[in-house]
Amino acid sequence: MTMPLLQPPRKNPVKRTPQMNVPPAARGRVALNLTAAAAAGRFELQQCLDCSAVQYPPREACVHCLSSRLKWREQSGAGQLLARTTLHHSNDLFFRERLPWQLGLVQMDCGPALVVHLHGDVAAQAAGPQARQAPQARVQVGARLDRAGRAVLIAFPAEETPHMADDTMLREMSCDPRLRKVLVTDGMTPVGQALVRALIQAGADLIWVGHAEPWKRHGSGLDDITALPQVSLVPLDLSNERSVTALAGAIGGKVDIVINNAEVHRTFGIQARRGTDAAKAEMEINYFGYLRLAQAFGPALMGRAADGTLHACAWVNLLSIYALANFPPHGTFSASKAAAHSLAQCQRAELRGAGIRVLNVFPGPIDDDWNQNLPPPKISADALAGAVVKALRDGAEDLYPGEVAQEWLERWRDNPKVLELELAAGA
């Protein structure tokens, strides 16, 4: 059984901070489809459209009928553990620093046999006395992103076990906020306050909550979350580089997860309002504010990516499903989020070398004041915050919470041009 994670002793400031060595990242183009699915929290394998055989490892032609018509499809993950072994030596620096490492061979119910990483509880069950009576333990295989941002396969126990998320190997594949220190950039909004509550429920050790306009605290709900023992209020104005730099100098070396939820949202297109003041305000926070924050806190996260059990691990961007295709009634807001999405892809590429996960969140309309005139369904702040915490635990890179976001994503994947035409027509 996995032992619960405990708060480690305070770090000796004189000791050298280890540098991150990421696992091997080389993958072929076909195999990257496995990573693309894992980034969204799905376990997919290739399936032949002619003979229905499920394939692994990824390939160009079916191993049974040689057909090239292979489609990536989500799999249940159920299977049987056939064999296990323990890796005690590796020339790869990532694994060398984390030995011993459990590996296994799993026969999937859908067909292929997979070499997988073993969750500690599976390995213990396979090595224990009960293994003689049940040598082929039932397992649940899932895809996770490793510290290099590439998909790996992990065999989990068929049924949930106590403290399952605290497994040493699994924590290398996730960004669980439990016992970690988190910065939430805007605590004045319902989403920011919901994030704080969700993080506390998930076991976060300390949460810094940013506020740009302290004179607006009354009636904003900020006093309620400030009263929580895990919360520390900090001044943070993303439109002011001096404010961002000062906060990074004060807490940058302690933050494990940054959640950038600060945004300006106005409901204008191009012709609805003369001038550029509203669009500038949106870009100033949604894009340039994000850029200032990334420049100030990014190097600190990278420097602590291998700093013990509770190392720096993740950056979360609250974007919008409007970043994929412009929603004309909120046209300038959509444009600012599209710019932020592009910047987030650059940030992900830069932080990947240090093993820092960048989670981009693309919610549909949030149930707040600026979406008042949009009809349901709209996602609540609490539902959005819960989805973000779950995505951190699962180690995902892309999250589309809410019914509208899921629908738009499917339409965008099917045909981006058709979605553009539908949105222009108000559909």
What are these regions (language model features)?
Residues 188-189:
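Conserved glycine-rich cofactor-binding loop
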Residues 360, 368, 372-413:
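C-terminal helical subdomain
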